[in-house]
Structure formats: structure tokens, C-alpha cells
Amino acid sequence: TKRQAQEIIKENAERCGQYYVNQRWLGGMLTNWKTVHKSITRLVKLNEMFEKGELAGYTKKELQGMKKEQEKLQLELGGIMNMGGQPDLVFVIDTCKEALAIKEAKKLGIPVIGICDTNADPECVDLPVPGNDDAIRAIQFYSEMISASVLDGMQAMIAEKGVKVEEMVEEKA
């Protein structure tokens, strides 16, 4: 993911409760889920270890190595840590840079929405959105629109089931 898009993607994905990858796409993140899930399990185990203070019996060097591993895994997999399996849709900012993610999604039949700049091939994504994938303001705009659409879709789905969003808000209060 482009450096200028990393924080924007994280904020908007968290705002609508969706999973995200805002660092380098790891090969096999979708197509080799078993291996990725093992890494996520390791991350959860390390997080629990450090939170509970179960650090007795480890040397300073071992603890330092585990902390470094935890930070690396958190950076790479933190946005998909609670994802149970394949996503229903993949949204990509730069279709040229994220070609591997698009290829994996296509292989699994997952629809892809992609921002296609003038240097990109719109044929590689299912729903191309023509636009600038470099400018921070443009990235912010696209991310906010997708986030708002997800929230609208969730609200419509909840309303369809007969639950009013206002009632849910009142129950939580």
C-alpha cells in the first residue's frame, strides 16, 4: 500500500468495522489462508503473552526477539487479525501496485473494486473507478465513500431484518 494511503485506509476501514491491509500485500494472503491463519494465531498468542505478563523463563534476548516478531506480525496482519476467512469484496487503491492482491482475489472469485489511474488497466478489476490514486485528498475521498457505502449497506440490511438502528443505539446507551 502506498505510504500516503496507509493511515487513511486504516481509519476508514476501522470506522465501518471492516478488515484491511495497509502494508505490503503478503503473497498467499487470500489463496494460502491456512499459513496466514497460523501467523495470525501466533500473533494472538504473543499479544496474550505480553498482556498477561507470562514472560517468566525467557531471557532478555528471547523477549526482545518475541517483541520484534509481535510488532512485525501486528504491522502486517493487524488489520485482518479477526477475519474468519475470505472476504466478500476487495477494495484496492492502486491497481498497478496491488496486482498480486487483485490476482489472488480473481483466482478465488472475489469481486474487486479498484481505483484506476491513467497508467492502470481497468480490465483487471471487476468494478473500476477512474481516478487519481496518488493524491492524498483523492485517496481520502475514495476511502470515505467506500466506508460510507459499507455503513449504508449495513444499515439497510439491519432495517430489512426489522431492527431499527435507533433502537440498537438506545439499547447500547
Residue spans for each PLM region:
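Extended, charged alpha-helical interaction scaffolds
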Residues: 60-92, 96-113, 117
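Long, charge-dense
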Residues: 8, 12-66
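Phosphate- and divalent-cation-binding pockets in alpha/beta enzyme and binding domains
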Residues: 4-8, 100
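Short, ordered loop/turn segments at secondary-structure junctions
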Residues: 1-3, 18, 23-28, 95-97, ...
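Short, well-ordered alpha-helical segments in soluble proteins
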Residues: 44-54, 67-70, 74-77, 81-84, ...
